Amino acid sequence: MSRMAPPTGQHATTSTVILRPADQRFHSQLDWLDSWHSFSFGSHQDPNWMGFGPLRVINDDTIAAGQGFGMHPHRDMEIITVMVEGALSHADSMGNSAVLHAGEVQRMSAGSGIVHSEINQT
């Protein structure tokens, strides 16, 4: 079996998956938001938990009814929202709007920049 070298200027990398128990994740709590962070996020920074390859954020957010994230910017990233329960309204600066329901998934490409909001509709 032969192994191909990576293209010039790229490096071959291997990553080891490390199981991180839920009770060892970072936790943030506000009046309207209960959030568990698998990697360093916001004020929770640990150089040993910066992400996995290009993946930088996995947050498990519970948002109070009628509350959420007002319009805020992102760029140069893909954002995946997986709805476990409830309904979440999404609106963005590209004119897109939708309500996501339990069991649905949304992918948003921030590319050169986008502004969006996410509000719990339940």
Each predicted region: which residue ranges?
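Basic/polar N-terminal segments that are highly enriched at the extreme N-terminus
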Residues: 1-20
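Histidine-centered active-site/metal-ligand motif
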Residues: 72-74, 90, 116-117
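Short beta-strand segments in beta-sandwich/barrel cores
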Residues: 62, 86-90, 105-106
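Hydrophobic, well-structured mid-protein blocks that either form specific transmembrane helices
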Residues: 108-122
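A short glycine-rich, His/Asp/Glu-containing loop-to-beta-strand
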Residues: 24-79, 84
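Catalytic micro-motifs at enzyme active sites that drive phosphoryl/nucleotidyl and oxygen chemistry
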Residues: 69-70, 94-96, 119-121
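Short acidic-glycine-tyrosine-enriched beta hairpin
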Residues: 92-109
